[in-house]
Amino acid sequence: MLKALVSLQMLFGYSRLFIMKLTAAQQKYFAYWLTRSLPSDSLGKLTASLQDAQVDLTPHQIDAALFAFKSPLSKGAILADEVGLGKTIEAGIILSQFWAEHRRHLLIIAPANLRKQWAAELQEKFFLPSRILESKTFNHYIEDGNLNPFNCEEIVICSYQFAKTKAPYLKQTNWDLVVIDEAHRLRNVYKPANKISNTIKNALADRKKILLTATPLQNSILELYGLTTIIDDYAFGDLKSFKMQYNRNLDETDYQNLRRRLAPLCKRTLRRQVLEYVRYTKRIAILQEFFPTKQEQELYDLVSEYLQRPRLYALPNSQRQLMTLILRKLLASSTHAIYGTLCALIEKLEAKLKCQGVEQSDEDLFKYDYEDYESETEEWFDDEEDENEPDEEEMLSPEDIERVKAEIKDLEKFRELAFKIKRNSKAEQLFEGLNQGFAQLEELGAPKKALIFTESRRTQDFLFDLLEKRGYKGKVVLFNGSNSDKQSTAIYKAWKEKHKGTSKITGSATADKRAALVDYFRDEATIMIATEAAAEGINLQFCSLVVNYDMPWNPQRIEQRIGRCHRYGQNFDVVVINFLNKANAADVRVYELLDQKFQLFSGVFGASDEVLGAIGNGVDFEKRIAQIYQLCRSPKEIKEAFDALQEELQEQISDKMLKARTTLLENFDESVKQKLRSNLAETRDNLNQFEQTLWQLTRSFFADFADFNDNNHSFILHPFFDNGALSWFRRFPGEYMMVSSEHRRTTKLNDGVRPYRIGDPLAQFMLTGLKSVSVPVSEVTLDYSNSPLNVAFIKRLVGQSGWLKVEQLTIDSFEKEDILLHACITDKGETVPSDIAEYMLRLPGSEDPLNVELSETVATALADAITAQRAEITAANAERNNNFFEEEMEKLDNWADDVKAGLEKELRDLDAEIKLRKSESKKTSRLDEKVRVQRLIKDLEKRRSEKRLNLYQAQDDVDSKKEELLSKVEAMLAQKIEQTKLITFHWRII
């Protein structure tokens, strides 16, 4: 890279290379200015990451990201914004900052069904590479010789269950940052029996972590304790001392004390706080009811009765509950879906008879039709401490063989009935639902687009054929896990041809196919039929109609479905169509729960944090519903079971916990709103200056090799001639556009146009090269008269000349910080303030060979000015570090006090028990009872004596631990200082 730059210098010289009114010195200066590291308490710290990302600026997200960097001694943060406020974006900004600082061992632990969404968001919004690790890919890397697939230069994404299984690998990896999504799953980590939570916590001890959760507190204050220990074991004392202080009826003082101690760890923003920045659209629900035909009802009853049998040879005991749930989903989806699965069950039983004792894969049962089987299996067991082992295949007895044959006959009967049913009642109602939905969209002024969700590939194929035949020919597109049908293949081929030679093509066939189908849906099709698994991670804000053709029982999955369209950036209200079998009492009650209790389908925000938090990942809720379908046969039993479930849900949504969460975590006063406003204004100013500097520098550097359009900040970079060192440049030709942060929502890049950003390889090449070049001392003319700058001090310098010198000071203590030191002096000996020198460097400049010498007197004056600035800055840095140290000291003091208080309470409890036993002894008249109680008292007194002896030792141990921690912090406190000379030139202002 450097050779290429040097070759350019030799070919054209500075006068030709550095044009567009920026001198060589200015170019080098701005390269350092754009890439400097800022301190954690600076609003400008995230400027480069924000410019690099394709996200709209919202103040609460910037505030949350800055909170995570608030102290260099912090071990992480809990970001607990309400649902819908973009915690993923907040984490993305933080990850971008780590990536930019070349701290790239990054891990995301998320629910299995959110992994693809994370990967897509990182790529689309932040240009960050990632890899999803699960069993197959992990084993593939191992086979290829990678001994630890977690150790890589990509962001690793995995599920909770996988993280638990591979804990030894996690522990070996030196993570720079770990992001844990839906972190409330770990809130019971304080319970030793909670193996998943404790395994993950122990594997990631001492790593910096960001926890994302909308519900950090649901059932008990102890959950907050659990989450804080994942971040920092020294935020509070041990569990005993925490219970003693906070696990009781708290008064206002207790709440304020706990709030103060949580404040450095937890950040929460409410939706009502950001309404002036974030526009929310509503959800409008349409319920499409239907009644099954006599044949459909007969099939449902027969299969349902079959699933309720005590023993089934077709389903393994270890996974029977999950597989029964899936079969019920397919049964409710369509006769086509259940027909294919019945065929698979028959084949499995026939194979069982032929190959007794041979283990069979149950995944093959659903391999084609139910794509989500693998991730649902993983999620199903995520909350279980020991995943069920697969059943071992045993030899069948003669009686078993006869029973298997009878089961096959029953399944064949069901299959025959399913085959006879050609028309599905629900499918007939689909057209009525679409007509209503499209009419509603027309009224809203929204585009005529519908996203239909089904859980079955066979139902997807059936609906595609049906819609194509009845009014939507050529207007339907499929979206599933393989996307290998003829239509999708043709769409992909045309898309590749259209975008040939552009950055739109990533090289990943899977990702490019998904992009091609989304583009086709946006530009050509009216309807997309998507399966559950495939639709993870795609954003379809251009569509405002969601059709739940099959209704999941898990509210979290429904929320994710609707969230594909009802999300930030949606311009219209979103219509949600649901189908309900009115003949099925259980279906009716499930819909009532989802609609009325969870409020998923209407309103502005969808499901509330309280309700979603009460069900966690939704799997337990789903299991309860599956259990009702399995065990309840009469309408009365169904009603009683659902009434009990609803009552349990109400108990989980505790008013007491809502009050605690409001008091401890929420802050809604005018000062918060004012801070958000001022931070947003300052961030916009920082970004504007950053973008203008990057544009001017790029314009100057590539002046001879590109055509620039200043109106829209775009340029076309021409192919460089293939000439040795310059051949490296050939990677970059094409059209670029730098979209300013304030116009990202309204600006759409044309095909083939690359977004120009600080992290683009072209920009990185330019910056690295400029920082590497030695710039000779020269004569620089700065043109104030023709610049838009209006600075009285500089105006006074017009016609004068002098010297300007810039050095970079790098301080590395608790964190790394780069400061540009400016020394400026006129030829008359007047010192120019450093901030004025900064302004001078932003004036248009031209350069000539040096015609005056730098005298020793002037050189000394410049050096003295630099030294004075250095002293001032190092003192300020030390003061800031001292504040960080004091905060850490206070935290450790509190921790030590907590632990000691817990130990002292044990002694007090023993004193109280001894007193109670003595009172009992006095009251009893029986000698044998007196003897028994006296022996008990003696044992208690012995324990008390031991406790007293141990107490002082334990308190000393706590103090030693505190001293050890402080020594570690103190070692970090020492400033490592490096100073780099950048530029020196003689200036003249005209």
Residue spans of the language-model regions?
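SF2 helicase/translocase NTPase motor core
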Residues: Y14-L66, K70, K75, K87-I89, ...
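Inter-lobe coupling linker of SF2 helicases/translocases
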Residues: N151-C152, V156-W175, Y190-R207, L217, ...
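Signature of the SF2 helicase/ATPase Hel1-core->accessory helical subdomain module
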Residues: L170-R248, A535, F542-Q560, R564-V574, ...
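Conserved Helicase C-terminal RecA-like lobe
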Residues: Y280-P292, I338-E524, K673-S727, N882
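P-loop NTPase motor cores of the ASCE clade
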Residues: E350, D364, S654, L658, ...
